[in-house]
């Protein structure tokens, strides 16, 4: 990866892509999992002999295409199960266009290349969302101080509060509140397993239900949560056998819960820097939904931008295949 240069405002480079973990196609899935665990990453880029992007491999791929399919991680190479020739953004791509694409296509990760097709890094939409929220919170704090100062002047001099300031502060406040967790409810119950369920069976259920997390129950009560990232870090990287290892050994116990009226931004803030997902409860103490870091910014993103190119493909002007 080349040294970073000053990022033009409004571009993908300004989003500060993270350094990409890179591996070769002939690496076994077991070896890749160990590397991902050592680096605490859930996504790697696969590069060819010229160090150009040949594919992308994620924790979800390992859970769905390897463990969930009953394939042994030590017997299969990354090349056999990676997503080949992934869509990539260029460093000078519009940041808005790149994020819109990630939301529209359901990508959590998007590789970034420079004008010479060398790897510049990788975008993680959850990190982008956290960064945007921090900027919005700083803007709100500054605007609120100005609002309070003007309110003090109004009290002393009897003047009315400038409508522009009132409108600006209110607009930022509304953006920060955003949609609630209830808005992402699908009406479908969360996927559950027992403490005795094997990792292989849990991964197969994830694949079947198109989810990256399952709730673990013991005698009718939720006792833990198990995710695709756990499959990588706690099972395959540790050399455990998914067919004989029960989820109770490798789950995250006592997951956090949140009410359905919590805002998506608040939920993301609650999960920031933590490996667990959050389960939400309805008014009758019923588990309504389990969701991870990715679907939340996706849902919030849909609230902010519903643009679509009309044909479901990205404009070649700003995105390209590796």
Language model feature labels by segment:
Residues 1-322:
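Tandem CBS (Cystathionine beta-synthase) repeat/Bateman regulatory domains
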């Amino acid at each position: 990866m080349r040294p970073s240069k000053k990022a033009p405002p409004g571009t993908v480079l300004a989003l500060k892509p993270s350094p990409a973990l890179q591996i070769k196609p002939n690496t076994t899935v077991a070896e890749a999992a160990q590397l991902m665990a050592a680096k605490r990453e859930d996504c790697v880029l696969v590069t060819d002999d010229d160090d150009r992007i040949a594919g992308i491999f994620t924790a979800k791929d390992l859970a769905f295409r390897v463990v969930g399919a009953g394939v042994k991680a030590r017997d299969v190479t990354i090349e056999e199960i990676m997503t080949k020739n992934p869509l990539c953004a260029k460093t000078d791509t519009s940041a808005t266009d790149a994020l819109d694409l990630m939301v529209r296509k359901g990508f959590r990760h998007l590789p970034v290349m420079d004008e010479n097709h060398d790897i510049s890094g990788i975008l993680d939409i959850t990190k982008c969302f956290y960064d945007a929220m921090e900027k919005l919170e700083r803007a709100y704090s500054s605007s609120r101080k100005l609002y309070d100062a003007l309110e003090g002047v109004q009290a002393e001099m009897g003047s009315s509060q400038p409508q522009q300031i009132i409108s600006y502060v209110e607009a930022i406040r509304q953006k920060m509140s955003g949609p609630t967790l209830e808005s992402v409810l699908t009406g479908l119950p969360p996927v559950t397993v027992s403490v005795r369920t094997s990792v292989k069976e849990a991964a197969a259920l994830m694949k079947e239900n198109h989810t990256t997390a399952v709730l673990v129950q013991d005698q009718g009560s939720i006792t833990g949560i198990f995710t695709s990232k756990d499959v990588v870090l706690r099972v395959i990287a540790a050399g455990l056998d998914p067919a004989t290892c029960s989820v109770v050994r490798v789950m995250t116990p006592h997951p956090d819960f949140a009410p359905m009226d919590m805002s998506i931004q608040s939920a993301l803030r609650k999960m920031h820097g933590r490996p667990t997902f959050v389960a939400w409860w309805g008014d009758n103490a019923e588990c309504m939904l389990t969701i991870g870091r990715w679907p939340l910014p996706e849902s919030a993103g849909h609230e902010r931008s519903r643009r679509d190119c009309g044909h479901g493909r990205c404009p070649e002007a700003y995105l390209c295949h590796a």
